[in-house]
């Protein structure tokens, strides 16, 4: 029997998301679904010395658009998010390895949709 898993792409997903992918024979990103503001597609929480902190990609409401249609904004959010990860996990084991994995996606300005950005991050792991 073939195991198929289908999910919307998430921004910096939790461990269980990767377990879902690993346990499936076929994984499908379902990014034709409607984008919903203030959801895991464009934000996530990280924990640092000061407690939980939201990291949100400022994409706006994008009412009526699918996840794959949401355009990434210009601005400093990419470098700010990388710096937030670096600062909050500076003393964590393997932080440099993690930054080596995710930095190319954050630095690639040709990735201009939320769906492509999230999928690129997920595929790097």
Residues of each region from the PLM?
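Residues lining hydrophobic/aromatic ligand-binding pockets adjacent to catalytic sites
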Residues: 1-124
């Amino acid at each position: 029997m073939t195991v198929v898993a289908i999910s919307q792409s998430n921004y910096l997903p939790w461990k269980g998301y990767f377990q879902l992918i690993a346990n499936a024979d076929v994984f499908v990103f379902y990014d034709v679904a409607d984008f919903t503001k203030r959801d895991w597609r464009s934000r996530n929480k990280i924990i640092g010395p000061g407690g939980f902190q939201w990291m949100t990609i400022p994409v706006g409401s994008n009412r009526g658009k699918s996840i794959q249609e949401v355009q990434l904004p210009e601005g400093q959010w990419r470098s700010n998010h990388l710096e937030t990860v670096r600062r909050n996990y500076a003393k964590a084991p393997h932080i440099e390895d993690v930054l080596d994995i995710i930095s190319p996606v954050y630095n690639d300005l040709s990735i201009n949709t939320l769906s492509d950005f999230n999928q690129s991050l997920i595929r790097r792991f």
